[in-house]
């Protein structure tokens, strides 16, 4: 808690994947963890009760979410690969309007080469195939959104990849 408070009003988060720390201020006076409920009510000193981990938004504001793979080889040795289609496997849940996510394909020409954003495409609930263009020896895929009330679950990342010669 802060120096002027007798109750918890600060938080510290360490993100192991991104190797960074986050700090902030959020007063909490009680926490009820029933063990069988998926809703976690939390009391505050301002006489509000919050339900944590409910919905897809941040108290009425859009909450950004993303999933990003590590680099993976798309072709062995000296050969490049050409990625020409993305076949999305994504389920939108509890979303309002026309939900969508953005797929970004990042490529490298070599293991120590610069990571380049090669192709970006938007995928909605009715998208069956997205035609894209990306070329490299290694690829990384990022799926993200920052829309209000947009819940989604990612399945397999399916790409149409062809051998594309040397350079």
Predicted regions and their residues:
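Beta-sheet repeat architectures centered on beta-propellers
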Residues: 1-167
